[in-house]
A protein has these predicted regions:
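An active-site-proximal "capping" alpha-helix that borders the catalytic cofactor pocket
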Residues: 63, 273-290
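Long, well-structured alpha-helical subdomains associated
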Residues: 285-382
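Short, glycine/acidic-rich hinge or "gate" loops at secondary-structure transitions
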Residues: 64-72, 88, 258-259, 293-308
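Contiguous, non-catalytic segments that form substrate-binding/exosite surfaces or channel walls
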Residues: 36-232
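Active-site recognition of the HExxH zinc-binding catalytic motif
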Residues: 235-252, 280-281, 285
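A well-structured
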Residues: 1-52, 68
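Extended, compositionally biased alpha-helical segments that mediate assembly or anchoring
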Residues: 365, 369-420
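Post-HEXXH active-site segment of zinc metalloproteases
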Residues: 251-278
Length: 420
């Protein structure tokens, strides 16, 4: 099926639009036409036993909120209605943090419209989680601080958000393949973000391994040695948190170019994931600068944040610029280079210009947020075609990193897996 065929079908059959754009349907041929089939039907043979297992788990847990989520998610697998179980997950307060179901849309390269199934089993690190709760009291201030007109700001979105720092003990499905997730902000349902907020989950042991095994070595290879001392795990850790918080900041449901009130992902189509990941990265920096200025963060300063962020962009680009995170990183790198926030220092290395980095971040945040606020597909396309690309400069750096792991590959020995 082509993009054009899909769009022509919706144009000719507007009653099908909602089902066709639903996160939880597959599109298949039916005679000469197309039909949307709910996941609960398309994957019944897998989801029925999965629902049974969730009910078995619910029967043996003593935590009421975890039990509620597991039972609700089991029902969702068979009904295809995930709203109640997503609300139950946001409200869940359990020492075991469980995520299971269809969530991210990165695998849908045509429209970023279909969610893939994944699972995380984690244990909550309560002391670390408590340390970060202070930021939640300032989400409205961070929204107010966004570099866009007030008409584009949304003070309801994310107001009920929570933060959990966890230790990952098992993953499966979409979470297991390819680039390993370091943190996530869910659910993606804008109705729930508006009414209940979202949950930000940081996988601390994963983040530590990523920084140690690939992030820091890459940054030391790319940056001028004079700035090596500014590399900071605390800056990386907090920027990852603020990246996730920033998924809940800015526009979500908008009045689009067609006058309809819909999620901006509908209008941005295949460009949405890269725009959103880049927005979260850049707005994360912008909001973290706010936290530094207000003394909410004292473990590092702005120069350490700038250097750590710049140094780790190549880590994301190595995932592939066609991937949402890699494309977003290329966009950032090329934008900062154009604005003079990152400059060559000789011998293929680069330095961060602290005097220009903040303004470059502000300008890029404004551009990305405006695209999301207006649902401007053409503007998104122009931005990505100009900046989310490989360049001779980038291609000259990548070969020099080939001895550094692209990412980590977890082995869950507690689940019976063996080291290779």
């Amino acid at each position: 099926m082509t993009r054009e065929e899909f769009e022509k079908w919706i144009a000719a059959h507007p009653a099908d639009q909602e089902a066709f754009q639903n996160l939880y349907t597959v599109i298949r041929r039916s005679g000469p036409g197309l039909v949307a089939i709910p996941y609960s039907e398309a994957y019944r043979d897998a989801l029925t036993p999965a629902a049974d297992k969730l009910r078995e788990a619910a029967a043996i847990t003593a935590n009421a909120s975890l039990k509620k989520f597991l039972l609700a998610r089991a029902d969702a697998f068979l009904s295809n209605n995930y709203y109640d179980s997503d609300v139950a997950w946001v409200e869940m307060d359990s020492p075991v943090e469980v995520v299971i179901g269809p969530y991210e849309v990165y695998e849908d390269e045509m429209f970023n419209a279909k969610a893939a199934f994944e699972a995380f089993i984690t244990v909550v690190d309560r002391p670390e989680s408590e340390k970060l709760k202070v930021y939640l009291n300032h989400l409205s201030d961070m929204e107010r601080n966004l570099p866009i007109p007030d008409a584009y700001k949304n003070f309801k979105r994310g107001s009920g958000s929570t933060i959990k720092v966890v230790q990952e003990i098992f993953t499966a499905g979409d979470a297991r393949r390819g680039v390993q997730t370091a943190a996530f902000n869910l659910p993606n349902d804008e109705r729930i973000r508006q009414s209940n907020g979202s949950k930000n989950v940081l996988l601390r042991n994963v983040m530590q391994a990523k920084f140690r095994q690939s992030g820091e070595p890459i940054a030391r290879r790319v940056l001028d040695p004079s700035q090596d001392s500014l590399l900071s795990f605390d800056a990386y850790y907090n920027h990852t948190l603020f990246h996730e918080l920033s998924h809940s900041l800015g526009p979500g449901i908008i009045k689009g170019p067609d006058g309809k009130m819909q999620e901006n992902r509908i209008y941005l189509k295949a460009f949405y994931s890269t725009i959103e990941e880049c927005k979260a990265d850049v707005v994360g920096i912008w909001s973290l600068l706010y936290a530094i200025d207000k003394k909410l963060v004292t473990a590092f300063d702005a120069p350490k944040l700038f250097v750590t962020d710049a140094g780790l962009l190549f880590r994301s680009m190595r995932f592939g610029i066609g991937e949402a995170h890699g494309g977003g990183a290329a966009l950032e790198w090329n934008w900062y280079r154009e604005k003079g926030a990152i400059v060559p220092s000789g011998n293929g290395r680069f330095k961060v210009d602290y005097t220009k980095f903040r303004e470059a971040v502000r300008m890029l945040a404004e551009e990305l947020l405006t695209i999301e606020a207006t649902g401007d597909y053409a503007r998104a396309e122009r931005l990505l075609k100009k900046y989310a690309v490989s360049t001779p400069e980038i291609e000259a750096v990548i070969p020099g990193l080939k001895d550094i792991p692209v990412d980590i590959t977890p082995v869950f020995v507690g689940a019976g897996e063996k080291m290779p």
